[in-house]
């Protein structure tokens, strides 16, 4: 369970009687910060709708090898964090440096709604990062904007993964695997960032769809697809990614490794792919999910077999905490 980090006089819990807007920096100043058993600093404010057991389970999913890189971050779970609002002069032209500076200074502070309302929900965003000074950052996550535990967990894990990769970088063993897959023309990717930077690395337009290579026969070919039953978030059972066999689409044309490669975009691609893999790995530890739930319109999903290979590398680098388990199981769909 989480322990309180004592910073001065004990603070009494805040009772929220009606929805109101509060400066995020003020929340960070006034709200008690706690620490999960694996070292994640966090706090809650307002009517989050989160049960303590569910929150603890989500926080404690993060392996201690990853939380060591999160010391500068405190995760604030709030009902709604509002989108950035700028003063009227924020549209000053970029060629006017003085006006642009004034525009930036005129930015309103990050505001948080203490409870859910339709009006505040329309103005909310999934999360806001707030610099708190002295190298500290507050990540304010909108718990009431997420449709379910899956969405909230993934939002949290995405933020954790980005912060971790910013500090730790991309391991060579993962970079080698992901780049080999990209050179081999593996289908799809794990995020729009990974999809676009991978295309740009090979000199293609960011939204390019590579042509498939013809194959002589597709009979008896198989393709792994993640599928799992979703269960109660607070369950103590270890989460497992279940993989089924279905017919494979045609593979994409492999890339000539001697062709011109944009090294900057390649580095950005590998960073995005690793961050995505860490987030999906954490999600698989927290709860069961169907791989199709990660599907987006802007790009095709990475082939499940390729994703499984990436996740295994992440699991070897950052083993699960006690009470959590990572596994990939295969089954043939009838």
Which residues are covered by each model-predicted region?
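A metal-dependent hydrolase signature that marks the N-terminal structural subdomain at the beginning
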Residues: 1-150, 317-334
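Pan-zinc metallopeptidase signature
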Residues: 1-37, 230, 239-334
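Hydrophobic (often cysteine-bearing) scaffold residues that line and stabilize catalytic clefts
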Residues: 149, 153, 157, 267, ...
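Post-HEXXH active-site segment of zinc metalloproteases
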Residues: 150, 154, 166-219, 290-301
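Catalytic glutamate of the conserved HExxH
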Residues: 155-168, 277
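Short amphipathic alpha-helical segments and their helix-coil junctions
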Residues: 199-263
């Amino acid at each position: 369970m989480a322990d309180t980090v004592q910073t001065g006089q004990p603070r009494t819990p805040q009772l929220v009687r009606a929805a109101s807007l509060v400066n995020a920096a003020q929340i960070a100043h006034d709200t008690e910060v706690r620490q999960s058993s694996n070292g994640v600093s966090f706090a809650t404010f307002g009517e989050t709708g989160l049960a303590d057991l569910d929150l603890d389970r989500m926080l404690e999913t993060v392996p201690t090898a990853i939380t060591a890189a999160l010391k500068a971050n405190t995760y604030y779970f709030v009902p709604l964090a509002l989108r950035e609002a700028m003063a009227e002069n924020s549209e000053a032209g970029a060629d006017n440096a003085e006006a642009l500076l004034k525009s930036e200074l005129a930015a309103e502070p990050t505001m948080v709604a203490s409870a859910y309302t339709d009006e505040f929900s329309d103005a909310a965003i999934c999360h806001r990062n707030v610099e708190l000074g002295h190298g500290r950052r507050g990540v304010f996550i909108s718990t009431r904007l997420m449709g379910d535990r899956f969405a909230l967990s993934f939002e949290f894990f995405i933020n954790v993964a980005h912060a971790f990769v910013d500090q730790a970088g991309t391991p060579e063993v993962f970079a080698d695997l992901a780049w080999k897959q990209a050179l081999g023309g593996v289908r799809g990717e794990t995020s729009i960032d990974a999809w676009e930077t991978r295309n740009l690395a090979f000199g293609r337009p960011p939204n390019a769809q590579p042509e498939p290579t013809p194959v002589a026969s597709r009979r008896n070919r198989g393709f792994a697809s993640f599928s799992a039953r979703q269960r109660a978030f607070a369950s103590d059972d270890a989460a497992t990614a279940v993989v089924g066999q279905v017919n494979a689409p045609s593979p994409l044309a492999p890339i000539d490794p001697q062709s011109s490669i944009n090294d900057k975009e390649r580095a950005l691609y590998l960073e995005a792919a690793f961050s995505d893999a860490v987030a999906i790995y954490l999600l698989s530890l927290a709860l069961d999910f169907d791989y199709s739930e990660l599907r987006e319109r802007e790009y095709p999903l990475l082939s499940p077999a390729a994703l499984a290979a990436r996740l295994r590398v992440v699991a070897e680098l950052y083993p699960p905490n006690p009470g959590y388990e990572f596994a990939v199981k295969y089954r043939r769909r009838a």
